[in-house]
């Protein structure tokens, strides 16, 4: 490998917790399901010039494996089963599942294969892309600058929260996928550990090494895949919610609400689901409007909102988190997941707005119709129309 291309990743656990949580559920319920996913850059960055360097990193990823101490640590967690962990010990990334190309300056990446394997590519691959691009673009930037920025933010945060009861404020690191570098994320998390309101990280490797609580449940792909797994499209979201409870009947109970808009989600989120799930996660649309809808829904079902948790994770920074905390903290339990604004906040460094999203399940289209129109992803306009009809949604403006 060249100097710039020393391996970004050093652990199979350098990923978001929900990837392993979903992978276990797929392993037990949908072992033979096949999927395809695609990379998207939501900004105007032309990243195609990094295709060769990224391809080199992908080849290096096949050497990652679950180490014995990592296996032992996962085994001590309450929600992993022995059959899955034994399978995970043998898991290796297969670079043949990934195609990378430079399409007139645009970076094109497509993943395809068994869902149980493909599911693990997304987060580490995005972290690789982010770190490789920043290595080339911002070689002068370093950990000290990231830490200085955080310290300045924490001073502002202290002033902002002076006199405020912060006993119900809980912050999590969600910064793996778009971090400046692995080193920056670890440094930021170590500093945040000193704060009483910092409760954990979505990164399993950091959680293990820093004795933190790993955070995460499921992502959009869980709901998207059920659009083709479920025989009835209109029932697919309920099928996804029910299958999750089969795998995790009394833990990991935060449900993501915006795969097919919050309104469609709440229509499916009846009293049984609302009682059994511990709470909801916001990832698109207006957060105050969303939170008010969630609280009203719980009340309508006769459930005390104080017994539930709302997790906010959409484009948050510390200031936004405090605003939401002021608005909601007396009525519901709260957690805040901050990603890019913690792990890629360095002067003169432009964070990447990059995602990898499911586009097919068993050879058929799937879609994400979130509460932010710009986040909609699907190639097949006919399927988008069918999905909107099945969930009684108004006409879509544009799928991107």
From Swiss-Prot:
Q: In what pathway does it function?
A: Cofactor biosynthesis; NAD(+) biosynthesis; nicotinate D-ribonucleotide from nicotinate: step 1/1
* GO cellular component term of the entry, any: cytosol
Q: Which reaction does it catalyse?
A: nicotinate + 5-phospho-alpha-D-ribose 1-diphosphate + ATP + H2O = nicotinate beta-D-ribonucleotide + ADP + phosphate + diphosphate
What the entry says about post-translational processing?
Transiently phosphorylated on a His residue during the reaction cycle. Phosphorylation strongly increases the affinity for substrates and increases the rate of nicotinate D-ribonucleotide production. Dephosphorylation regenerates the low-affinity form of the enzyme, leading to product release.
Instruction: Enumerate the GO terms in the molecular function aspect.
Output: nicotinate phosphoribosyltransferase activity
Q: Modified residue Phosphohistidine is at which positions?
A: 220
Give me any GO biological process, just one. Answer: NAD biosynthetic process via the salvage pathway
Keyword set, alphabetical order: Ligase, Phosphoprotein, Pyridine nucleotide biosynthesis
Q: What is its EC number?
A: 6.3.4.21
Q: What does this protein do?
A: Catalyzes the synthesis of beta-nicotinate D-ribonucleotide from nicotinate and 5-phospho-D-ribose 1-phosphate at the expense of ATP.
Q: What is the similarity comment for this entry?
A: Belongs to the NAPRTase family.
State what protein this is by name: Nicotinate phosphoribosyltransferase
Q: State the organism named in the record.
A: Shigella boydii serotype 18 (strain CDC 3083-94 / BS512)
């Amino acid at each position: 490998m060249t100097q710039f291309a020393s391996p970004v990743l050093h652990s199979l656990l350098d990923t978001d917790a929900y990837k392993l949580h979903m992978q276990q559920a797929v392993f037990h319920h949908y072992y033979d399901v096949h999927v395809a996913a695609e990379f998207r850059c939501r900004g105007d960055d032309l990243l195609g010039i990094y295709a060769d360097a990224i391809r080199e990193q992908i080849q290096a990823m096949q050497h990652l494996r679950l180490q014995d101490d990592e296996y032992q640590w996962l085994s001590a967690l309450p929600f992993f089963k022995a059959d899955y962990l034994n399978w995970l010990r043998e898991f290796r990334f297969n670079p043949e599942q990934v195609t990378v190309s430079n399409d007139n300056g645009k970076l094109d990446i497509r993943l395809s294969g068994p869902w149980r394997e493909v599911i693990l590519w997304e987060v580490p691959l995005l972290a690789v892309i982010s770190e490789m691009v920043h290595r080339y673009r911002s070689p002068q930037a370093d950990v000290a600058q990231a830490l200085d920025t955080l310290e300045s933010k924490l001073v502002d945060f202290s002033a902002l929260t002076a006199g405020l009861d912060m006993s119900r404020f809980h912050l999590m690191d969600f910064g793996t996928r778009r971090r400046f570098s692995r080193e920056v994320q670890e440094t930021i998390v170590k500093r945040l550990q000193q704060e009483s309101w910092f409760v954990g990280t979505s990164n399993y490797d950091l959680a293990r090494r820093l004795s933190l609580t790993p955070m995460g449940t499921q992502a959009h792909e869980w709901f998207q895949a059920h659009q083709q797994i479920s025989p009835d499209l209109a029932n697919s979201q309920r099928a996804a919610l029910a299958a999750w409870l089969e795998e995790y009947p009394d833990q990991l109970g935060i449900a993501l609400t915006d795969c097919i808009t919050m309104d469609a989600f709440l229509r499916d989120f009846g009293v049984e689901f609302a009682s059994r799930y511990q709470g909801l996660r916001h990832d698109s649309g207006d957060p105050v409007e969303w939170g008010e809808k969630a609280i009203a829904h719980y009340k309508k079902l006769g459930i005390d909102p104080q017994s539930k948790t709302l997790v906010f994770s959409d484009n948050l920074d510390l200031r936004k988190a405090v605003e939401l905390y002021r608005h909601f903290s007396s009525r519901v339990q709260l957690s805040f997941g901050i990603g890019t604004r913690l792990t890629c906040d360095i002067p003169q460094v432009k964070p990447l707005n990059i995602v990898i999203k499911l586009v097919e399940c068993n050879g058929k289209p799937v879609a994400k119709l979130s509460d932010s129109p710009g986040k909609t992803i699907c190639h097949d306009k006919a399927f988008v129309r069918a999905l909107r009809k099945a969930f009684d949604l108004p006409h879509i403006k544009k799928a991107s």
